[in-house]
From Swiss-Prot:
Main location per the UniProt record: cytoplasm
Taxon lineage: Eukaryota, Metazoa, Ecdysozoa, Arthropoda, Hexapoda
Entry's Gene Ontology molecular function annotations: acireductone synthase activity; magnesium ion binding
Keyword annotations from UniProtKB, A to Z: Amino-acid biosynthesis, Cytoplasm, Hydrolase, Magnesium, Metal-binding, Methionine biosynthesis, Nucleus
Biological source species: Drosophila mojavensis
Subunit structure comment from the entry: Monomer.
Protein name: Enolase-phosphatase E1
Pfam family, one: Hydrolase
Free-text comment on the cofactor: Binds 1 Mg(2+) ion per subunit.
Subcellular location: Cytoplasm; Nucleus
Length: 249
């Protein structure tokens, strides 16, 4: 199908490598959380939210592994939990309590103005064009819904949150499983064929297509290179410009 033939009621977008540079997450957000975990935990140690996060972190099997590497029995305090959170980040373990902690740290950073969410220049323009055409825009990312909203609310292009109608994270299912996209379509109240999913990951595009969605791959700077098999299986665009004239069916 040619790009000019595409139509949709909902545009479902991935974040990393699609609306936002992969380097923003790995080079800005993750280091910020690592650098500020100790201070955040110290300041909020007595709050119910932080107590819950600490309890969930210390119940992880990875915590048992981590504690066994220490020379002495650890005291559960802010510094120790901050060290454990850095251990998880360095191992790229995206466990739920860590994502919750990171989300709280990022929220503080966004609120103070230290952090601004990266979006590509064409994203805000396309979002506005799709919204003006009556299309809904939804987000599906492995990052928590709270973290998603922060990126778009505090973006370098301004507050894009009013243009977004729904957010999905791994609570709906993993991104390479077809059932996740079926659930998303049901939640949106549309047939899967009326959803256009934009992602940089071929395995996600394949899962969405198997659910009946239309899919387009993004070849943004810094993204993993696409193989000939991928480029023959899916339409590929360098940015959202070619999709700005998308209309409803």
């Amino acid at each position: 199908m040619a790009l000019t033939d595409l139509s949709a009621k909902v545009v479902l977008v991935d974040i990393e490598g699609t609306t936002t540079s992969i380097t923003f997450v790995h080079d800005v957000l993750f280091p910020y959380a690592k650098a500020n975990a100790g201070q955040y935990l110290s300041e909020t140690w007595e709050t119910d939210d932080t107590k819950q996060i600490v309890e969930e972190l210390t119940q992880l099997p990875q915590y048992t592994e981590y504690a066994s590497t220490l020379e002495t029995r650890p005291e559960i305090n802010a510094a120790h939990i901050a060290d454990f959170s850095r251990y998880l980040i360095e191992k790229d373990l995206k466990v739920t309590p860590l994502k919750t902690l990171q989300g709280h740290i990022w929220a503080k950073g966004y609120a103070s103005g230290e952090l601004k969410g990266h979006v590509y220049e064409d994203v805000a323009v396309a979002f506005q064009a799709w919204s003006d055409a009556g299309l809904r825009i939804a987000v599906y990312s492995s990052g928590s819904v709270a973290a998603q909203k922060l990126i778009f609310q505090h973006s370098i292009a301004g507050d894009l949150l009013p243009l977004l109608s729904a957010h999905f994270d791994t609570n709906v299912g993993h991104k390479q499983q077809t059932e996740s996209y079926t659930r998303i379509a049901e939640s949106l109240g549309v047939e899967p064929q009326h959803v256009l999913f934009l992602t940089d990951v071929p395995e996600e595009a394949s899962a969405a297509r198997d659910a009946g969605m239309q899919t387009v791959l993004l070849a943004r700077p810094g993204n993993a290179p696409l193989t000939a098999e991928h480029t023959s299986a899916f339409p590929v665009v360098a940015n959202f410009v070619a999709l700005q004239s998308l209309k409803q069916p």
